[in-house]
């Protein structure tokens, strides 16, 4: 059953989902053709091509339904339109770690999250710990390697 809870994301995340949906919908008729071709080869009980195509069709249909659900619940947020002194979805934050080394993250949705580029999900342990914090607040996050401590040094809405 689909959820009716709003799903915050940036315009970039919405674009990524829309492009993936278009790609999957374009693949859909190709899979149907592959199923028909495999079906023409006879006995379906031992037809690996048929079963692989049917499995791929199921994956595509599930992915399409998931993306359509997420897009229907999307609440697109433009960080440049936000302001305030607390960390919220879309904010870009500069933190000082245990070594006083600055690290910078933007709080984003699950679709856009990519730690390598400094984008963390609001649902991640660090994202959850940061939401609502202000400059000079300390943040403690438990990660597999132990507890990490950060100091919020800057909040930007860019």
Swiss-Prot record:
Signal peptide: none annotated. Residues 17-75 form a coiled coil. Keywords: Coiled coil, DNA-binding, Transcription, Transcription regulation. The keyword Coiled coil applies. Gene3D superfamilies: Transcription elongation factor, GreA/GreB, C-terminal domain, Transcription elongation factor, GreA/GreB, N-terminal domain. It comes from the Bacteria. GO terms for molecular function: DNA binding; RNA polymerase binding. PROSITE patterns: GREAB_1, GREAB_2. The keyword Transcription applies. One of its GO terms (biological process) is DNA-templated transcription elongation. Necessary for efficient RNA polymerase transcription elongation past template-encoded arresting sites. The arresting sites in DNA have the property of trapping a certain fraction of elongating RNA polymerases that pass through, resulting in locked ternary complexes. Cleavage of the nascent transcript by cleavage factors such as GreA or GreB allows the resumption of elongation from the new 3'terminus. GreA releases sequences of 2 to 3 nucleotides. Belongs to the GreA/GreB family. NCBIfam families: greA (TIGR01462), PRK00226.1-2 (NF001261), PRK00226.1-4 (NF001263), PRK00226.1-5 (NF001264). This is Transcription elongation factor GreA. It comes from Rhizorhabdus wittichii (strain DSM 6014 / CCUG 31198 / JCM 15750 / NBRC 105917 / EY 4224 / RW1) (Sphingomonas wittichii). The lineage of its organism: Bacteria, Pseudomonadati, Pseudomonadota, Alphaproteobacteria, Sphingomonadales. The gene is greA.
């Amino acid at each position: 059953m689909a959820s009716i809870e709003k799903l915050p994301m940036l315009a970039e995340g919405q674009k990524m989902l829309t492009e993936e949906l278009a790609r999957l919908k374009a693949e859909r008729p190709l899979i149907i053709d592959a199923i028909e071709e495999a079906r023409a080869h006879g006995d379906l009980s031992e037809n690996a091509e048929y079963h692989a195509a049917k499995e791929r069709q199921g994956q595509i249909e599930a992915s399409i339904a998931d993306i359509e659900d997420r897009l229907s619940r999307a609440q697109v947020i433009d960080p440049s339109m936000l302001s305030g002194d607390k960390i919220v979805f879309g904010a870009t934050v500069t933190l000082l770690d245990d070594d006083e080394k600055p690290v910078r993250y933007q709080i984003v949705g699950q679709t856009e999250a990519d730690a390598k580029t400094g984008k963390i999900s609001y649902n991640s342990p660090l994202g959850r710990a940061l939401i609502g914090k202000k400059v000079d607040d300390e943040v403690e996050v438990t990660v597999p390697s132990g507890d990490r401590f950060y100091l919020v040094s800057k909040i930007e809405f860019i």
